[in-house]
């Protein structure tokens, strides 16, 4: 499951209702249980653009709301997530992206 690909294909992962509809479509197509890894990346382009341009977590069109949906989704709680985002030489952007995702996950846990 690649967040940018899904967004670029026109699925709404940002609104709560859109997230539920996206997961329902995925479940109907192949089953949520078959998702074995998630490529977490924001999108430089708008939803439905059919263009795969990754952006740093929280810096694109998916934004924090979309990643809050992902990180608090019970079906994906134990699914590994891989940052597939632009890189800087010092690794600062990856550290920031991981921190943002962890913070969103903690909100579900009440932290």
Regions found by a protein language model. Give the residues of each.
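Short acidic/histidine-rich active-site segments
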Residues: 80-86
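Residues that cap or initiate secondary-structure elements
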Residues: 44, 87-89
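A structural motif corresponding to the C-terminal end of an alpha-helix
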Residues: 29-33, 66-79, 104
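A generic structural micro-environment signature
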Residues: 12-13, 46, 63, 68, ...
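Short, electropositive alpha-helical surface patch
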Residues: 17-20, 24, 51-68, 90-109
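Acidic/histidine-rich catalytic cores of soluble enzymes
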Residues: 1-56
